[in-house]
Amino acid sequence: MKLISTLLALFFVFQVTQSQDSVQSIRNYLHVNDQFCTGGQPRLEHLEMLKKEGVKAIINLRQPSEHRAAEEEAKAKELGLRYFNIPVVFTDPKDEQVDEFLRITDDVNNRPAFIHCTAAKRVGAFWMIRRVLRDGFTVEAAEKEAERVGLVESPHLNEFARKYIEKHQKK
């Protein structure tokens, strides 16, 4: 019995350690497709893991003052990753920031890309816009995927995304 308990404990420790040593341990991590993955704030060691997974660019939607952004940028560049910071205020995203996001994500040289903010709520809103305007999703389908990305409990971001789509969608 003691042997079984010990083995179970070791298995649990292995599972916890293994999960912390993968990109899956990034908050709200989602491998959307072979070109994009999304998530919340990565740790610096996650950047190395993302590079090993084939990521070529990091797109950070946080403010420079949020969670050691300068260290993240330096680490990304040290690893040879392209690094883009679009400083989106959580409560006040701007159309120009979405325009820049779309330009960056449209460039195939910036793919595969990992797109993040703190909890992936801003990412969800910007991703929803991209899915409708670039990938031909319906607003409803894009919204469902954006919720999986992290756009939850943020009605102002959802409203912003819908208004941006309405203004820019070809009739």
Describe the residue ranges of each PLM region.
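A periodicity- and composition-biased signal for non-globular, repetitive helical segments
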Residues: 8, 127-128
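Sequence-pattern detector for short linear motifs
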Residues: 5, 124-125
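Basic, ligand-binding patches in group-transfer machinery
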Residues: 2
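Bacterial N-terminal signal peptides
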Residues: 5-15
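A phosphate-binding catalytic loop at a beta-strand-loop-alpha-helix junction
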Residues: 113-124
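Cys-dependent protein tyrosine phosphatase-like superfamily
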Residues: 18-113, 128-171
